[in-house]
């Protein structure tokens, strides 16, 4: 089931998609992680929204460098801190 995303989320996801289609093919595969940083960014924004998703993506991109071995690094799940269920 497709969920509705905010305008900001759609813009950010669109920018990442443009990067994937136009820039990434020119520079080649460089990401050390699975999923790639751009896929991670899309998943993070869809899961956590624009603010937290952007923050998670920036942290991930800063980890993606030659001195980090990389590997499997999924988007953390959204934790529901709803106190009404207690």
Curated annotation (Swiss-Prot):
Keyword Cell inner membrane in the entry? The reply is: yes
Topology relative to the membrane = Peripheral membrane protein
Q: Where in the cell is it found?
A: Cell inner membrane
The highest taxon in the source lineage is: Bacteria
Keyword annotations: Cell inner membrane, Cell membrane, Membrane
Q: Which family does it belong to?
A: Belongs to the UPF0161 family.
Task of the protein: Could be involved in insertion of integral membrane proteins into the membrane.
Identification of the protein by name: Putative membrane protein insertion efficiency factor
**Which organism was this protein described from?**
Histophilus somni (strain 2336)
